């Protein structure tokens, strides 16, 4: 997302600091939260609060806003919460290292 020369990471809004704010060619916004490991059940609440803020802010009126949470080993509770919210998607990443 670009704002007067700023784009990419750490987009700041009054209620917090987004890891990434992205915009597609149709003007839809994507709040991306990146978590370094598991144990982030509050990631849903945090992302939902960000989405609610964008939906209420007049500067973003008419834009669709979605949340994307990326983390390693999400709990079933987090999976269930995200699947129940049509605004959000959940991605799990895995890292492996191989000695060469």
PLM features: residue spans?
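Charged, terminal alpha-helix-loop-beta segments
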Residues: 1-100
